């Protein structure tokens, strides 16, 4: 469960969020909507731990943990991260290499050894099947020539791995 209680946030001295409260239960999907400048991106940035946002009051808890006390890496590992609205293309870098490098960097941060190739391929195949994605996707350059939907599925695949 994600719970935001009476959250107040300033950016460069300007009050952006003024007492926001929100509860999202496991399995629920919510859309945060509002006009430009309402604080949608600010809320996402604060939850993800982006620098430059000052929480002046309130709490954020995720699965019983105080999000505001978590490092950015801890938040990302817990699934609290921001996806790019327009993911960058990386010509010449295949998805399979990016996925393995990202996973091994995460494992290294936790003090774990690199994942063996057979174990990595098993994990990737499971996640591809879950996402209903073809394995040829792995050989394509990261986001290069992808449709909008493919870019989003690629981001979800990265998150799952």
Put a short name on every predicted segment.
Residues 2-4, 17:
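Conserved structural motif at the start of ABC-family nucleotide-binding domains
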Residues 14-17, 74:
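Short coil-to-beta microelement around the adenine-binding A-loop and adjacent beta1/P-loop entry
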Residues 31, 68, 76-85:
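ABC nucleotide-binding domain signature
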Residues 33-35:
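The feature captures the beta-strand-to-loop junction immediately N-terminal to the Walker
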Residues 59-75, 143:
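ABC ATPase NBD Q-loop/coupling interface
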Residues 88-161:
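ABC-family P-loop ATPase nucleotide-binding domains
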